[in-house]
């Protein structure tokens, strides 16, 4: 790892004409492989769908997590989702149009029937209140972590993994990369191919 950084710095020195050549250019070193993105699989989602939780906050966290999986929205975006972000096309299909909190890029997401079913349980009329009455991310994180433990996952389950799961789901259904980028409000169109 250190040799990799040293090599980059030396190439910068060569580019800025501080050095004539890179003295470690031909030195062999092990290159780190790119980390594999973790995501929620279809099988895991089927198990999550089949395990309603009794406690109110835990069930709210589970439903918001499922909603994240079927919309690709991050926790911060679900928390700021208001009824005004939900619309209907001329053909009668419902969708979400919202600017992502992280990037400010607008997402246009047709609603999956399971996401619509979850929406019907929460606020879709009061424009001044969010759709989901979510607590802070830290308090809901414990509920999501417990779901991961029940699933037998060795890593902590996260909303980001649900978002990646949505991307993988779309890719497996042969949705175009351009459409996926628009739904996930990605800045670079090459991002979905990393999944």
Role assignments for model-derived ranges:
Residues 1, 60-62, 134-138, 154-174:
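Short basic/aromatic active-site micro-motif
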Residues 1-12, 27, 111:
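Non-catalytic DNA-binding core/recognition domains of DNA-processing enzymes
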Residues 15, 66, 70, 76-77, ...:
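C-terminal catalytic core of tyrosine-transesterase DNA break-rejoin enzymes
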Residues 2, 15, 19-75, 79, ...:
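Basic, Lys/Arg- and aromatic-enriched nucleic-acid-binding interface segment
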Residues 187-195:
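Conserved small/polar residues in nucleotide/adenosyl-binding loops
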Residues 7, 60, 74, 107, ...:
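Short, cationic motifs built from Arg/Lys/His that form the positively charged side of catalytic pockets
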Residues 30-35, 51-52, 56, 76, ...:
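Basic, Lys/Arg-rich DNA-contacting stretches centered on the C-terminal catalytic core
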Residues 112-154:
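Active-site/catalytic core of tyrosine-dependent DNA strand-transfer enzymes
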């Amino acid at each position: 790892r250190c040799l990799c950084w040293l090599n980059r710095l030396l190439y910068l020195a060569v580019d800025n004409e501080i050095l004539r050549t890179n003295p470690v250019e031909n030195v062999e070193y092990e290159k780190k492989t790119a980390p594999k993105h973790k995501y929620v699989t279809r099988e895991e989602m089927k198990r999550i769908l089949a395990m309603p939780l009794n406690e109110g906050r835990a069930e709210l966290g589970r439903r918001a997590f499922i909603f994240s999986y079927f919309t690709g929205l991050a926790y911060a975006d679900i928390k700021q989702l208001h009824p005004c972000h939900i619309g209907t096309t001329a053909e009668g299909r419902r969708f979400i149009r919202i600017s992502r909190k992280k990037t400010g890029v607008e997402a246009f997401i047709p609603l999956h029937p399971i996401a619509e079913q979850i929406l019907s349980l929460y606020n879709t009329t009061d424009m001044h209140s969010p759709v989901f009455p979510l607590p802070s991310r830290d308090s809901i994180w414990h509920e999501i972590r417990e779901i991961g433990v029940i699933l037998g996952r060795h890593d902590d389950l996260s909303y980001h993994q649900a978002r990646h799961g949505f991307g993988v789901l779309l890719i497996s259904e042969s949705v175009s990369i351009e459409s996926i980028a628009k739904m996930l409000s990605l800045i670079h169109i090459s991002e979905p191919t990393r999944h």
